[in-house]
Amino acid sequence: MNVLVYNGPGTTPGSVKHAVESLRDFLEPYYAVSTVNVKVLQTEPWMSKTSAVVFPGGADLPYVQACQPIISRLKHFVSKQGGVFIGFCAGGYFGTSRVEFAQGDPTMEVSGSRDLRFFPGTSRGPAYNGFQYNSEAGARAVKLNLPDGSQFSTYFNGGAVFVDADKFDNVEILATYAEHPDVPSSDSGKGQSENPAAVVLCTVGRGKVLLTGPHPEFNVRFMRKSTDKHFLETVVENLKAQEIMRLKFMRTVLTKTGLNCNNDFNYVRAPNLTPLFMASAPNKRNYLQEMENNLAHHGMHANNVELCSELNAETDSFQFYRGYRASYDAASSSLLHKEPDEVPKTVIFPGVDEDIPPFQYTPNFDMKEYFKYLNVQNTIGSLLLYGEVVTSTSTILNNNKSLLSSIPESTLLHVGTIQVSGRGRGGNTWINPKGVCASTAVVTMPLQSPVTNRNISVVFVQYLSMLAYCKAILSYAPGFSDIPVRIKWPNDLYALSPTYYKRKNLKLVNTGFEHTKLPLGDIEPAYLKISGLLVNTHFINNKYCLLLGCGINLTSDGPTTSLQTWIDILNEERQQLHLDLLPAIKAEKLQALYMNNLEVILKQFINYGAAEILPSYYELWLHSNQIVTLPDHGNTQAMITGITEDYGLLIAKELVSGSSTQFTGNVYNLQPDGNTFDIFKSLIAKKVQS
């Protein structure tokens, strides 16, 4: 499910960053946290796939102006569908029934009713004087009282007090200001409530609404980058000592909305990067020397102080060491307590008498095991770059062309156990945990086939890569062909939902998984995403250089399911049938099998074209005879029958109205329209035959 953070008129870059990063820390991998604009919230079918919508800090009035078209959708999402609305600071003002901001100040006053009305009363602010737009001048570490009697301080800059919150039956006060605000917190009596509400939780229909005046989502790690010395000394230093309490509070309030949060505090901090280890297949050691020569050509030079070589690439800087044992301590210590996106990345090449790093340096990925299962004749994957904690296996290659162009053609696989800046479609980033195997393969393709002399369409690479991964899973060991995993066009892997399997009392062992008999839709979703592919294309030495970035849920179930879960389910069936149990799945073997299949499939495609590969693809995709609606053509119903061999578009034949078997003769080519939630809800169709 998605958690959508509004990023549009009224937001500030800093507030969006804090909200996104903080929510990812607490909610991933159970939810996919990403930013959206008004157009997405107005036009795309996001509600059925979303658990929460978040409005971060900024300015309330632009929210009112820009978001008027989506007010009714937000209210329906919360009250009717049981969704969660979260408003931090300006988002908190936006979610109330009335705003009174800086009353009496002719330069800043904003007063008026608000249409969301999740909180039935007034939000009044700034709760404390001194606020200035786009400034830290009025910022402070504000002390909050919690219901259990404890206190902690968090960042505050212009937020509201929720007036008379204790008088509303549907409102729970989660935190109050320890010091009386500078504005009236009550409209009765002396004008001050004994419990001036700073954070409230409202029950609205079937849903929950969390509104805050202060910024408990603000991470002190990002605030340390401020150049304001006074702010650093008076606010940031105070907040550093409060970080554990802030984390506990955030988890508490997010959990109260019904969201599923991580249980480990270590998960909410980006861990230190670890060294990257470069190794080769035993018979491909010459590729290591070729890469080092290429790096020198691109400017790698010796650093006699650090006893390493350095390369200042396009986005990142790199330090290259030689010798796993000799260099590990120095390479590791240079990464400690450094921001992952700012520190030079360290890469260790083997020493003269070394082949594979000692296992104690890579306890979560046995590189020797990987090369054991890699075909000896393989070029793809014959160089392995592994890091336990990396920024992103894709971004580090995609953003540093001098590094990328130093890699021998079609050789490298980059694997990471934990990504602190994992990258997905639309530029989304996240921290992926252990149990989600992230990898990026670097493959090179000619512009034309050496056999047929036909131009090669690189769009097919995403199909071929998913086909290779699917084949690797199903051939992992005897019995793995029963795992119900299939390809969702164009580049995702989906598995049958364990919940659906149990509800329907299905049996899969030795029966053959017939995915065509199961529904592919939202009414009763039978499938869950377990893997996605991101392809980045470069042009190097008159050839395509393609980065195939893929993450797959091996053992981590959040937010969907995993391969290991399905192995466990099938083993329950096998035990009842007195069959040998399936082995646990290991990232090392799976990655090697993926490379083996990719090598074979790519060669077939390059030499003989898409026609050679598509029959295998059709056997493992979800869409044979799927019926789709074409909104650009009067909501015509059409049946998917295949993929074009030139540009990889879907082929759909128009159905006679009311029939699921008879065709009109009209044929359409279909492609996605960029819809980030359900590509089959909004396909762009071009008629190619009538």
UniProtKB/Swiss-Prot annotation:
Subcellular location: Cytoplasm
Residue ranges constituting the BPL/LPL catalytic domain according to the UniProt record: 378-606
Major location (coarse): cytoplasm
Enzyme Commission number(s) from the entry: 6.3.4.-, 6.3.4.9, 6.3.4.10, 6.3.4.11
Matching CDD domains: BPL, GATase1_ScBLP_like
InterPro entries, A to Z: aa-tRNA-synth_II/BPL/LPL, Biotin-prot_ligase_N, Biotin_CoA_COase_ligase, BPL_LPL_catalytic, Class_I_gatase-like
Cellular component GO terms held in the UniProt record: cytoplasm; nucleus
GO molecular function: ATP binding; biotin--[biotin carboxyl-carrier protein] ligase activity
GO biological-process terms attached to the record: protein modification process
Keywords: ATP-binding, Cytoplasm, Ligase, Multifunctional enzyme, Nucleotide-binding
Catalytic activity of the protein: apo-[methylmalonyl-CoA:pyruvate carboxytransferase] + biotin + ATP = holo-[methylmalonyl-CoA:pyruvate carboxytransferase] + AMP + diphosphate + H(+); apo-[propionyl-CoA:carbon-dioxide ligase (ADP-forming)] + biotin + ATP = holo-[propionyl-CoA:carbon-dioxide ligase (ADP-forming)] + AMP + diphosphate + H(+); apo-[3-methylcrotonoyl-CoA:carbon-dioxide ligase (ADP-forming)] + biotin + ATP = holo-[3-methylcrotonoyl-CoA:carbon-dioxide ligase (ADP-forming)] + AMP + diphosphate + H(+); biotin + L-lysyl-[protein] + ATP = N(6)-biotinyl-L-lysyl-[protein] + AMP + diphosphate + H(+)
Keyword flag Nucleotide-binding: yes
Source taxon at top rank: Eukaryota
SUPFAM superfamilies tied to this protein: Class I glutamine amidotransferase-like, Class II aaRS and biotin synthetases
Keyword Transmembrane helix: no
Known role: Post-translational modification of specific protein by attachment of biotin. Acts on various carboxylases such as acetyl-CoA-carboxylase, pyruvate carboxylase, propionyl CoA carboxylase, and 3-methylcrotonyl CoA carboxylase.
Subunit structure comment from the entry: Monomer.
Miscellaneous comment: Present with 1970 molecules/cell in log phase SD medium.
Family: Belongs to the biotin--protein ligase family.
Protein name according to UniProt: Biotin--protein ligase
